[in-house]
Amino acid sequence: MSDRAETKPETIKRWKDCLEAGIDRGEDPIIIITFRSGWDSAARPVLARGIDKREYVIKGQQAGRQIVNDQVVARLGMAIGAPVGEPCIVEISEELIAEDSRFSYLTPGTAHATLYIPKCSSEREEINYTNQPENRERFALLILLYGWVYANDYQFIYKNARPNLVYSVDHGHFFPGGPEWKQRDLLQAASAEINHRLVSNCKLKLEDIRQGLPLLDAVSEETIIQAVAAPPSEWGLTIDERVTLVEYLVKRRQDLLAL
C-alpha cells in the first residue's frame, strides 16, 4: 500500500464523488399535513405539523439560498452538540398550499425544517441569561459554531421558564455573503476565528470556548460532507458549490482547532 499523500485534485474528486452519492441517497422528506401560523421575517417561516405528528418550523424554496444555509448550519451545530433546532427535509404539497391562502407564497416541493422548540421567545433576542450556569456551555458551543461557519448576525432565542436555556435558530444569513454567497466568497474568506466581543458579552473566556474543541475535533470529514449533501438538488446548490463549501468548512475546522 502506498503512503503517498492525496493530491488536492484527488481530494476534490473524492469529495465530489461522496457528495454526489449523498445527494442521490437523500433522506425521505416528512410530509407536511397542516399549517399552523407564520412569521413575517424575511424568509417567512411557517409553523406546521408533519405526518409524524411532530411540529416543525419550515421555510420553503421561495426563501432561496437561506434554506441551504439553514440546513447545513443546523446539521453542523448538531454535530458539535450546539443548541440548535434539529433539522430535516419536509415536503409541501400544492394541495395543502391551495387550502390556505395565507401561505400561498410557499413553493411546493421539498423545504427546510427544524423541529419546533416550544415555550420559547417568539422572536430573536439579544444576549441574555448569561448568569444561568446551564447556559455557559450552550453559549460556548454556539460561539464555536458561529466562528466555524461565520455568522453575519446572532440568532438567540430562550426558553420562557428558568433556567431560560438559549438556542440558536434561523441561520439563513450565515457564511460570507449570507444568502447570496458565491464560491469566491468562501475561497477568499479570512481564516476562522472566534468573535472575542461575543465571548466577552456572554461573560465567557477563551478557555470556555476551547473546552468545546474536542467536540469539533470529533467531527469527521464524512460528517461535513453529509451536511453539505443534505440540501436536495432542487434547492439549486451545484456540485461545484458544494465541493467549495466542504473545502471551506474543512479548512475552518482546522483553523479553530489551532486555538
List PLM regions with ranges:
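Charged, low-complexity, helix/coiled-coil-prone segments
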Residues: 4-22, 79-88, 153, 167-173, ...
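Short secondary-structure transition/capping segments
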Residues: 2, 6-8, 108-110, 129-141, ...
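Regulatory N- and C-terminal appendages and interdomain linkers associated
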Residues: 1-36, 51-53, 69, 166, ...
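Conserved kinase catalytic-core segment
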Residues: 125-180
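A generic secondary-structure micro-motif detector
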Residues: 62-63, 135, 235
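A general structural signal for short secondary-structure boundary/capping elements
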Residues: 94, 156-163, 212-219
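C-terminal catalytic region of ATP-dependent kinase domains
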Residues: 166-259
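Conserved ATP-binding subdomain of kinase catalytic cores across diverse folds
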Residues: 16-125, 148-152
